[in-house]
């Protein structure tokens, strides 16, 4: 990994820590931020790029010195599980008491975000792990462009991808592989249809596919996830004023095929979701 990339990653981390939600814990001039500016901090992680996908546990082991400075002790469930739950609560806030470990969780999530962005550039696209979001040229002329751009900003701000990567290591579920696979199939088909002349809003398909199962992170213990995650998915999009994408995202069950008319975007998502479930 060359020095230019390390400098870019250092800059990306500082910018991430100066934006919400990290900015709630790291004020300008913070001692840790000053250290990051002079140390070349991301060089520490260069050895993790060995041609394989990064493991959150390996990143955590290299972040521990900073976490010890930021927080008194360690969460009882461990840093990875705590960071996972913290990110989940960014999507679906809950009433909690004081969170003394929140600065550490935000720092770890921010480091993961920078590292995963570098990983996406260095490794080949994997439909089960990564998302091929739309380019600016593809987005031009889309009626859903404003909502889609907002979706991508919130995807980063709320650490959605990092949440799913952590989930592979701290839960028994493979939610990332399912959501990424659905996105790949739906967007690939939408791009092909658009190229052939069919009127399809690829941005609407991409946003709905990437967000179609976010509601699973809103379900609470004891709730019936297969039924209620549609409601929580719709809730996430509505609260963030992206109802155009949310309407398609929340109605992806095969039972939604019953109405006489569905948009091509909705049909693509339902098909992709069904196909990925068959594959697994």
Regions found by a protein language model. Give the residues of each.
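Inter-helical turn/loop segments and adjacent helix faces that build the functional surface
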Residues: 193-197
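Active-site flanking loop/helix segments enriched in acidic
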Residues: 152-179, 213-221
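Divalent metal-dependent catalytic cores for phosphoryl transfer on phosphate-bearing substrates
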Residues: 18, 24-35, 42-93, 110, ...
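Short Lys/Arg-rich cationic patches that frequently serve as NLS/NoLS or arginine-rich RNA/DNA-binding motifs
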Residues: 1-5
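Internal, Lys/Arg-enriched amphipathic helical interaction segments that engage polyanionic partners
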Residues: 87-146
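A positional/architectural concept
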Residues: 181-184
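Conserved N-terminal diphosphate/IPP-binding helix and adjacent helical/loop segment
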Residues: 22, 26, 32, 148-158, ...
């Amino acid at each position: 990994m060359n020095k230019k990339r390390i400098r870019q990653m250092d800059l990306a981390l500082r910018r991430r820590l100066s934006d919400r939600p990290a900015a709630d814990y790291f004020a300008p001039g913070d001692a840790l931020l000053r250290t990051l500016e002079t140390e070349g901090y991301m060089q520490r992680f260069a050895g993790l790029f060995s041609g394989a996908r990064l493991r959150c546990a390996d990143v955590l082991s290299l972040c521990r010195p900073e976490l010890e400075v930021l927080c008194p002790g360690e969460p009882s469930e461990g840093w990875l599980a705590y960071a996972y739950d913290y990110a989940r609560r960014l999507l679906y806030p809950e009433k909690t008491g004081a969170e003394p470990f929140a600065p550490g969780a935000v720092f770890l999530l921010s480091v993961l975000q920078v590292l995963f962005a570098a990983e996406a550039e260095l490794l080949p696209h994997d439909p089960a792990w990564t998302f091929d979001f739309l380019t600016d040229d593809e987005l031009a002329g889309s009626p859903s462009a404003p909502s889609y751009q907002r979706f991508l900003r919130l995807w980063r701000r709320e650490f959605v991808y990092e949440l799913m990567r952590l989930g592979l290591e701290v839960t028994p579920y493979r939610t990332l592989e399912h959501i990424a696979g659905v996105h790949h199939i739906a967007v690939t088909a939408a791009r092909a249809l658009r190229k052939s002349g069919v009127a399809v809003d690829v941005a609407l398909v991409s946003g709905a596919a990437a967000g179609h199962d976010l509601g699973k992170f809103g379900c609470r213990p004891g709730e019936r996830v297969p039924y209620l995650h549609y409601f929580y998915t719709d809730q996430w999009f509505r609260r963030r004023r992206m109802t155009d994408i949310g309407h398609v995202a929340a109605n992806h069950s095969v039972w939604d095929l019953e109405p006489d008319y569905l948009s091509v975007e909705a049909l693509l998502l339902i098909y992709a979701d069904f196909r990925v479930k068959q594959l697994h």
